[in-house]
Curated annotation (Swiss-Prot):
Annotated source species: Polistes fuscatus
Domain SCP: 47-190
Tissue expression notes: Expressed by the venom gland.
Protein name per UniProt: Venom allergen 5
CDD domains found in the cross-reference section: CAP_euk
SMART domains named in the record: SCP (SM00198)
InterPro entries with a match to the protein in the record: Allrgn_V5/Tpx1_CS, CAP_dom, CAP_sf, CRISP-related, V5_allergen-like
Any one of the GO CC terms: extracellular region
Keywords: Allergen, Disulfide bond, Secreted
Family the UniProt entry places it in: Belongs to the CRISP family. Venom allergen 5-like subfamily.
Disulphide linkage map: 4-16, 8-104, 28-96, 171-188
Protein's UniProt keywords contain Disulfide bond: yes
Stored PROSITE patterns: CRISP_1, CRISP_2
Compartment list: Secreted
Length: 205
């Protein structure tokens, strides 16, 4: 794929700009990188946790919200892992621009959304605990308002996670030591993208 030819609303494609290598960049010099990329086991956990939560919401079992509960969904897809999405996410994760979104990450197939999470502690936070940070944003979500400029910063990770039309996910990660703490950094890319302003994340059942 010639990523330099892929169009986005702004910016140069991440893989065009940084190349295909997923080796941590010199920007990572202040960190002791322990591992690059999710393990096979973590890939399964990422997909399973997303689908568990998507089904919970789809079945109308998510009681949290502003107001809760969240309505059931009639059109929720199950997500599958996509290696291309994961590779693009990993190239970006390996730039060590912690908690910054890249500008252009689309594939030839579709526009691509993104969630980022990060946590540190005396022991390594596991991948599911990072995903739950996104799920917990449901507490601030009012389904009837959908995605607005006002609520996007508070609920955008949740809404991308449960965006019904999204079908594929691929994630990159870094595990590293800094200041005697173990850090886990996760970037998930989603296709087709969710989080269109003025839209609802799924069709109410």
């Amino acid at each position: 794929v010639d990523y330099c030819k892929i169009k986005c609303s702004s910016g140069i494609h991440t893989v065009c700009q940084y190349g295909e290598s997923t080796k941590p960049s010199k920007n990572c010099a202040d960190k002791v990188i322990k591992s690059v990329g999710p393990t096979e086991e973590e890939k399964k956990l990422i997909v399973n946790e997303h689908n568990r939560f998507r089904q919970k919401v789809a079945q109308g079992l998510e009681t949290r919200g502003n107001p809760g509960p969240q309505p059931a969904a009639s059109d929720m897809n199950n997500l599958v892992w996509n290696d291309e999405l994961a590779h693009i996410a990993q190239v970006w994760a390996s730039q060590c621009q912690i908690l910054v979104h890249d500008k252009c990450r689309n594939t030839a197939k579709y526009q691509v959304g993104q969630n980022i999470a990060y946590a540190g502690g005396s022991k390594l936070p596991d991948v599911v605990s990072l995903i739950k940070l996104w799920e917990n944003e449901v507490k601030d979500f009012n389904y009837n308002k959908g995605i607005t400029k006002q609520n996007f910063g508070k609920v955008g990770h949740y809404t991308q996670m449960i965006w019904a039309k999204t079908k594929e996910i691929g994630c990159g990660s870094l595990k590293y030591m800094k200041n005697n703490m173990q850090h886990h950094y996760l970037i998930c890319n989603y296709g087709p993208a969710g989080n269109y302003l003025g839209q609802l994340p799924y069709t109410k059942k």
